[in-house]
Structures are given as C-alpha cells and as structure tokens.
Regions:
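Short, intrinsically disordered, charge-balanced linker/junction segments flanking boundaries
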Residues: 216-223
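A short, highly charged nucleic-acid-interacting micro-segment common to nuclease
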Residues: 191-205
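Conserved adenosyl
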Residues: 212
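A short, surface-exposed helix-loop junction/capping segment
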Residues: 182-194
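Short gly/ser-rich loop at a beta-strand->alpha-helix junction or flexible surface loop bordering the NTP-binding
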Residues: 1-185, 201-202, 207-209, 219
Length: 223
C-alpha cells in the first residue's frame, strides 16, 4: 500500500498541472485520508478555498486559480463568468467579484460567489482546459451582479474602450429581457441609456427589442 507521504506528493504534482488547485474528491481518490488533509491544512502547507484546496498554500490566488477552483467545485457543466472570465480573455476590469453560471436544476451553494441559475444560452470559450463564458456574456453577467452605479460605469467603460458596440449590446441582451429574468429590469434601463445616447437609430432598435420581449409600456422620445 502506498504511504501517505507519496500520496501527498502525488496530490501536489496534480496541483501543479491544475494551476495550484485540487478538489477534495481528487485528494480522496489519490488516497490522502481526512486526518492527513486536516493536518496539512492546520500546518498551512495546504489551504482550503472555495470548497477546494490550494496546494501549496498561498495568500492569494490568481484569476486562473479562481477559475479552476470554481470549475472543480461546481462541475464540468458550469461556466466561469463575470470579471474573472473577462480578465482571462484579455479584458482588464478591476472588480474582484466571483461569478459563475450553473444549469438548472442544480442548486449548489458557495460562499463568496455569485451563482447564476437560468436557462439562457451562453457562448462558451475553452481556455487552458476551463469553460468560460464568452466576453459578451461575461460582461452581461457582471452588469447584473454588481451595484447599479457600478453597472452604469462598466457599460460606459465597455463602450468607450470598444469592448462592444451598441449593436453588440442589443444583439446580446434580447434573450435576457423577458419578464422575470434575473437582471432584466436593469438591462432594460441600460438599453434605454444606450438608445438615448445613439438617438433615433438606437431608439428604434430599442423599441424593436422591447416589443420582441413583450414589453409594450415604453415610449420612444418620451420626456
């Protein structure tokens, strides 16, 4: 039977291939018993984080580590979204909120993470073995997760830096505007702000968008 020492070495070898992160299930499968895990955590050699384990323990985890932790904890059907997914795809925003999408009817709980559960289609990008929401979807998930003032600032920044155009926005939000959808009211308000900024073309696009979503109480050019 393999010794605990060699099992620990194998876990640490696996962690190097997974951006410093291993799941508790992986640790158990390799053969490290719970008592040894507790000892390694208590001595600071390993560190518990987001329901998984950081190996070796570090004070901070980079975006790729966060994404790995979320994927291992939430399963292969989940998507890493929000600011983490944006930064990993080259869009540099400062917010450190952790956001992930999980399919219905799964109901995981994970402290410190905004979990989105819906049946909306999202584009998927695979980067370094991880499933990330494509930039436009990660941006929309961020917009509905942060505070209202932050969402306005983020949208302004995205348009100014040409991370997306007004047309990109309208194309992406139409499936999210149905009544009862998470964040739909906020997305409608932000769509109005874009329409007002782009004048008649934007207002016409916005009107079509709202009609398609069954929203009939909006009036263009209303003052």
């Amino acid at each position: 039977m393999r010794s605990s020492h060699w099992s620990v070495i194998e876990v640490e070898h696996l962690a190097r291939a997974q951006h410093g992160i291993v799941s508790r299930a992986q640790v158990a499968e390799i053969g490290v018993n719970p008592r040894m895990v507790s000892r390694l955590l208590s001595t600071g050699r390993w560190r518990a984080y987001l329901g998984v384990i950081v190996v070796p323990a570090t004070e901070s985890v980079r975006d790729i580590g966060d994404a790995t932790a979320l994927q291992l904890r939430l399963g292969p059907q989940s998507l890493v979204s929000g600011p983490t997914a944006l930064r990993l795809q080259g869009i540099d925003i400062s917010d450190r909120m952790l956001v992930a999408w999980v399919p219905r009817p799964s109901m995981p709980r994970l402290g410190g993470v905004r979990l989105l559960r819906d049946d909306l289609p999202r584009q998927v990008r695979e980067i370094r073995g991880l499933h990330l929401a494509a930039p436009i979807d990660a941006l929309l998930d961020t917009v509905i997760s942060v505070t209202v003032p932050q969402s306005r600032e983020l949208l302004d920044l995205a348009l100014q830096r040409r991370w997306l155009t007004a047309d990109d926005w309208f194309d992406a939000v139409h499936v999210r505007l149905g009544r009862g959808r998470a964040g739909a009211a906020r997305l409608r308000r932000l769509s109005l702000s874009i329409a007002e900024g782009t004048h008649s073309d934007g207002e016409r696009r916005c009107a079509r968008l709202f009609r398609a979503a069954g929203i009939t109480d909006w009036v263009a050019n209303y003052v």
